[in-house]
Amino acid sequence: DPGAQWKPGEPLKLLLAGYNGTRNTGADVRVEEMIRQFRHLFGDEHVEMSIYTIDPEKTRGYFRTVRQLHIPKIFPRYLFDTVHTHHAVVACEGSMFKSKFASALSTMMVGSIGLAAAEQKLAIGYGGEAGDMDEGLRALVERYCREALILARNRESQEVLRELGIASRYGTDTAWTFTPAAPEVGAQLLRDAGWDGVTPVLALCPINP
């Protein structure tokens, strides 16, 4: 039983699988921008989106028009049941296939798009990376993501995916097109935290794929 299958004339039921519900700014901004893009492309009448959240309290008020699904800590059966009721899955975390962040997170995304592919549904990774993986995770990705398409955010990730036999296209992180708040908003937040308005502020975001 392949579960829900899209038919002409009905909304596309799209499931977003990422790292949301922890107040990770990058993860939330990335997904907010994906949602804006999908709503723009499809129109609200043609798409019904759902998203996993680790903690619904931390995503309250986020992701307008999207149904939030509280994913449990032990998630294999939950993934199966949820993917089964959707037409397509988009994995949407930057650290998509790598062990340096959390293999459990990657396993959840592999499971989601792997289940979608097994049911002959759209299985997409959007704006992610593939990097160093432990042996178990690498084998999982190689086996279950072969029918997926990954829109990678750098060339290095494409090379890793090519070695695993997984189709990819070169793109970028969706957060690049997110419209931020005005600079004055950020300046006020810094002042509220003790900034004097003059001292240079250094922001570091190191990552090694």
Model regions and ranges:
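Active-site anion-handling motifs in enzyme catalytic cores
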Residues: 1-209
